[in-house]
Amino acid sequence: SMADINEMVELYLEDGYSYDGLVEALEYTFTHDEAVEAVDNCGADWNEQAVLAAQNTLEYTAYSYDGLYYMLMEYQYFTDEQARYGVDNCGADWNEQAVAAALQQLEFSSTSHDKLIEELVEYGEFTREQAEYGVENCGADWSEQAVKAAQESLEYSAYSRDGMVEELVEYYMFTDEQAQYAADNCGADWDEQALRYVTETLEYSPDSYDGLYQAMIDYYGYTAEQAQYAVDNCGADWNEQALKAAQETLEYTPCSYSDLYTNLTEYDGFTEEQAQYAVDNCGADWNEQALLAAQDYMEYLDDLTRDTLLTMLEFDGFTDEQAEYAVDQLGL
């Protein structure tokens, strides 16, 4: 009935609705025509509704001027003029909104002084002055924020102490002093972090004892002692790691027995015994590997003769018989 729809209109207008937003809300219960008629005759001042909507919105979440304007336009369907009137007249102190936004951000994510300013400017659409005011006045202990950020990072990935400091400085924008404090107070056992790094690495990529050890020191900031502890205690079967490495190599490039052995020892850091185990057990058909290598050469080099291709395959470590098989299959 009209009485029912008018009563519902009055209830909605207490919260602040735009014309289009109110029509949409009423259409869940009434027909479109009934909703339009009720809204056309409700006598609402849509500018004041925008003010009310802005005030109600600010009661449960902090917004910048531009952020609130966008919210009123895009999600509550006020016109440009109504949304502008709403934010201009809602009585908000945008500096204090920046403080509230900073506090809200810190409730669910740890961050640094400088990064929080950037987030308030970029995502919250506060002016830089408002963002700086908000961050300066939010009461955060930035050293403790660094500790929390370190602990959050450790939930998802293994880190060395130096790697953690670098992450906190480079990504989170903490000062070096704050990052050092966090690394010392986040509760990490760096030996166990090293072990975790090795274990996680070997889950998706085979590696040798020496390769892992050196990479941990050269690229990931672990000490020699931590790296040694990790590779000694990770439980890896290095023969099987060599075998996996050999099989992965053969998936993307053809190799001869001798070339594969050389790759495993000279480039991947496996021992001679581990490399020998791998090439003996990788299941490769060396004739077919020679054929694949020959086909690669034929694809990229024109006018190859039989003798030239034989020479190239033998240079790659294939036996005379394997090279002969390959060129015979190609009809040369």
Predicted feature descriptions by range:
Residues 1-332:
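An alpha-helical, amphipathic repeat domain used for nucleic-acid recognition
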